[in-house]
Amino acid sequence: MTTMISNLPRVLIEEIFFRVPLKSLRAVRLTCKSWNTLSKSRSFRKLYISKRATREEESMMIAMMNFDLYSMRVVVDDDVDPSKAFKKKRNKKSIAFKRQPIFLDEQVKISQVFHCEGLLLCFLKEDDTRVVVWNPYCGQTRWIQLRYSHRPHKDRFIYALGYKDKESRGSFQLLRFVDYFLGAPKNQYFWYEIYDFNSDSWTTLDVTPHWCIYCCDRGVSLNGNTYWCAKERKAEDDIVDHIISFDFTNERFGPLLPLPSKVMEHEYEIVTLSYVKEEKLAALFQHYEADWNEFDIWITTKIDAEVVSWSMFLRMDTGPRIEVPHICEGFFIDEEKKVAMGFEEDFDRKTFIIIGEAGYVRKLDIKAHVDRKCRPTVCSYVPSLVQIKKPARGKRKRQSSLEKRLFDQNMLRLEAFKKLGGYF
């Protein structure tokens, strides 16, 4: 007797889903109506997410390479011995590396990605007029039209995705701003605006920055807020020695919070933020020069909009025997395994590195053609139940006369700034 696919036992259907890679979930859900209904149930999603997060103790990440997104997993053996890190036979047994492409659309190329609570804010390589928010697990998307499009391939705006309601993790908003400061008040231009998912509208924010955030800093999301590396606006040097956050609930920036003072004594020029299980911030400190053989990673022991405290997670000082790898863009922390992972900043841009205690360094060739114009990046990722709210038809909030006037003023200021030679 043949059993129809729709009549398979639930436990068997669940096992099929658990074995399917993220990129194929949508196709499997659409196999039949009952499977699609099951996959959308809250109880099943919770079970699926729990199993995916713990299966084989894998570290799940989203990586961007070649203007495409990948679901990537790295399994680090519990028995990794840092003292044996440079013995090839031992190294080959300690790491398992997997990656699978996930497509928003096979024709759409991604130039940047920002992660918040399982949602991905994607910036398009060939379209500078809009961005898209995507939940890869649910297959939901929300396209957002920008009020002012940047120059193609030269986006100088900074973006952040967050939410107002900290209890339900709802009421999502998109922050967008540009801030140029060239040493004198007349040589500065800033414009801060926020998009509300519920009203489908943009609002200009009243912000006068006393800080400086560099346009190449993409920031990281933590508990609905976004954090960036920053410095005092009036500081004479370019050393980044603080972080700053944007609170989406109050729609305002918090105070400058200090990076760990001990590590700043090493005069690191590059500071990159990441997060640990969406609970803590992590800060990676590196030097510009390739011949430096040290770097530090610190993680927060307490973090909110007003207060921060730090603890050293990992320090590497190899001395002259080996150059410390330079991690490109985002990085991933496995707190239990005491390792950091990311793409190495090299010419070919196809080396993934894992760094641990006592000088442990493992380099993995991803064995793929790599577009050198695309800087690879990686971030932690856990599939999410968060729903992306669609705008109700005919419910778009009308732009007020005040908002129209503020927008026009910002555009006039922008044109004047360009005439002064401001790079935009």
Swiss-Prot record:
Family annotation (SUPFAM superfamilies): F-box domain (SSF81383), Galactose oxidase, central domain (SSF50965)
Cellular component aspect of the GO annotation: cytosol
InterPro entries: F-box-assoc_dom_typ1 (IPR006527), F-box-assoc_interact_dom (IPR017451), F-box-like_dom_sf (IPR036047), F-box_dom (IPR001810), Gal_Oxase/kelch_b-propeller (IPR011043), SCF_F-box_component (IPR050796)
Superkingdom of origin organism: Eukaryota
A Pfam family this chain is assigned to: FBA_1
Residues annotated as domain F-box: 2-47
PANTHER family registered for this protein in UniProt: BNACNNG10540D PROTEIN (PTHR31672), F-BOX PROTEIN CPR30-LIKE (PTHR31672:SF13)
Entry protein name: F-box protein At2g38590
Protein species of origin: Arabidopsis thaliana (Mouse-ear cress)
